[in-house]
Amino acid sequence: MTDAVKVGFVPLSTAPKGVLVVFTDESMKFGPASRKHLVNAGDVVKRAAAAAEFKGKSGSALDILAPQGVKAARLIVVGTGKAGSVKDEDFIKLGGTATGKIGSNASAVTLVAELPGGAMKPHQAAALAVGARLRGYKFDRYKTKTKDKDKALVAQFSVAVADVAAARKAFIRDAHVANGVVLARELVNEPPNVLYPAEFARRAAQLRKLGVKVEIFDVKAMEKLGMGALLGVSQGSYHPGRMVVMRWNGASNKADKPVAFVGKGVCFDTGGISIKPAGSMEEMKGDMAGAACVVGLMHALAARKAKVNAVGAIGIVENMPDGNAQRPGDIVKTMSGQTIEIINTDAEGRLVLADVLWYVTQKHKPKFIVDLATLTGAILVALGTEYAGLFSNNDQLSERLSKSGDATGERVWRMPLGPEFDKQIDSKFADMKNAAGRWGGSITAAQLLQRFVDNTPWAHLDIAGTAMGAPATDINTSWGSGYGVRLLDHLVAQHYETKR
């Protein structure tokens, strides 16, 4: 991993070093501090903008050698769109856009946190810095030779702000969340020969350093709990499965019910006996992205000392076609006592989640549960790579998730549930089957999960299209996106933290 965007905050008047980044809108005007940094170079910038057809549109940028008199080597002008149109959620994107233009040969960068109408507010400047940090991440641990154009950016970012102390305070909080995103990306990007279940559990256990209580369940412990669904998936692998339960008790009332998050952690998914086609099978190393998000989220909550009690639980397995592997036609008994007929061994994620959801529901009695899983290819057909599928038995929780998705850019789209779909997973031989017909595959998968949450408010996020291999964004060029960490941190911060 290269994650070397170092961020500091300086006064707006500080002389720039290295690369100077300023912001304008479609008026092509600059704020007062930016004008001072540009000295008398305004006309040169306008001519360069005209030649490059740069008009200040959102997401665009002009990159030129710094004109004479400007105390920097390069000048990058980032467009923000129509005057007055920038919203709070846009600042993180602006930081990412700027960083994407800088390249790998800069050692010092000054971002002037100012719009044409005046200085950015502290939380906006902090978001700008977070965007730079997230865009600067690159997973290159296993490269022994790297071309200059592919090298990661290693630079000191000085964010010039009106109120240094306030911006620094806001950034410290947001940086902990960004670190959680980076952790989730790291886990998803790791190759499966490195990140097998025991190693994943070991890395999750490192959250103990932040005050998180971590309990690791091995095969014997899960057998004792009766987790036949999870263990059935795991039984074909050389690497035995694990369940990891992480607890953060940050609420003023330690007895307050926790919020809970559950993640699917299939470290590699061949499909098992119902084996997948060879094409793109290597991407199934990312079938643990839901679990990665939960670990990243628990890191974020603990690091920023969130005033909430939270439980994060992940089921970690490999789905392999060994001689001892689960077969189509098998019937497994879950921790809940309900039985599941195996129709397709490649519908394994719901089996893992079934036992972990039931464990969390019964053991921790949470206020709500949100589970995340790269569960179905069908959700990609339905929603593409821009939205995660949201399924829920609770309108309030669903609405809150939708608003947090809009605020963070990690968007969700609610999908239906209902008895018409639920009956499709009924089995002739067991209480249910793990795969229904061809149509509505994401919905019938969610219907199975709903049978394991009792009456707990619950939401299921199918993140198959958003967590891995999604198109690059302003703040991410990594294969593993870390989707969900910022979304769920926002949900907790807005609605569930203790107010002091």
From Swiss-Prot:
UniProt-annotated binding residues for Mn(2+) 1: 269, 346, 348
Any one GO BP annotation for this protein: proteolysis
Keywords: Aminopeptidase, Cytoplasm, Hydrolase, Manganese, Metal-binding, Protease
PROSITE patterns linked: CYTOSOL_AP
Name of this chain's protein: Probable cytosol aminopeptidase
Signal peptide: none
EC number: 3.4.11.1, 3.4.11.10
GO molecular function: manganese ion binding; metalloaminopeptidase activity
Family membership noted in the UniProt record: Belongs to the peptidase M17 family.
One family name in Pfam for this protein: Peptidase_M17
Record function comment: Presumably involved in the processing and regular turnover of intracellular proteins. Catalyzes the removal of unsubstituted N-terminal amino acids from various peptides.
One GO cellular component, as annotated: cytoplasm
Named cofactor requirement(s): Mn(2+)
Reaction(s) catalysed by this chain's protein: Release of an N-terminal amino acid, Xaa-|-Yaa-, in which Xaa is preferably Leu, but may be other amino acids including Pro although not Arg or Lys, and Yaa may be Pro. Amino acid amides and methyl esters are also readily hydrolyzed, but rates on arylamides are exceedingly low; Release of an N-terminal amino acid, preferentially leucine, but not glutamic or aspartic acids
Cofactor info, note text: Binds 2 manganese ions per subunit.
SUPFAM superfamilies xref list: Macro domain-like (SSF52949), Zn-dependent exopeptidases (SSF53187)
Record's subcellular location: Cytoplasm
Residues of the active site: 276, 350
Gene: pepA
Binding residues for Mn(2+) 2: 264, 269, 287, 348
Origin: domain of life: Bacteria
CDD domains in the record: Peptidase_M17
